[in-house]
């Protein structure tokens, strides 16, 4: 079904590269856009979509590739306008995150407990991110997090994709974390 399409947009930083190769083998006329061109991530591919700045770069890559493929000036102008609309929205989101982070830092409430290191991009917005990511979690960090929940310094955990680990479930149960 996808091999009959005219255009395939994919993230070249994930396993979609294999899918893309298979599609090209079935459809030599398939136009390809790798949205991740020039981008990288540290903690997980999802941070590309969660961070307003990275999201904007993904959109810019799509816009630039589309403009290479398009012949109609009207459609090129439409693509440019839609990109500008999105850029404005994402710039506002970026500014809002910066404002929230700055205010939280001034109040001393900028610590965020998260389930996954993918949220570490929030450190760019003055948040102190404490992660329960199983791949990097140490016993000392876990004990510190538990102690802060016990003292009611923390009360919430941001959880990615409903990935409730045993540690997260235990903290929720023991300290009534949200």
Annotate the PLM regions:
Residues 1-178:
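Extracytoplasmic metal-acquisition and chelation regions
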């Amino acid at each position: 079904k996808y091999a009959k399409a005219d255009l395939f947009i994919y993230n070249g930083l994930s396993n979609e590269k294999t899918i893309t190769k298979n599609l090209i083998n079935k459809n030599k006329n398939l136009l390809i856009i790798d949205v991740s061109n020039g981008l990288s991530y540290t903690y997980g591919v999802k941070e590309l979509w969660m961070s307003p700045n990275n999201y904007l770069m993904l959109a810019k890559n799509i816009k630039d590739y589309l403009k290479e493929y398009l012949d109609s000036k009207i459609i090129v102008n439409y693509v440019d306008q839609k990109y500008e609309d999105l850029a404005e929205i994402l710039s506002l989101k970026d500014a809002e995150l910066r404002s929230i982070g700055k205010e939280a830092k001034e109040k001393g409430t900028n610590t965020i407990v998260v389930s996954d290191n993918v949220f570490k991009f929030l450190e760019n917005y003055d948040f102190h991110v404490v992660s329960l990511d199983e791949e990097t979690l140490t016993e000392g960090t876990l004990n510190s997090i538990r102690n802060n929940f016990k003292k009611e310094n923390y009360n919430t955990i941001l959880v990615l994709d409903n990935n409730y680990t045993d540690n997260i479930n235990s903290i929720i149960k023991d300290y009534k974390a949200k």
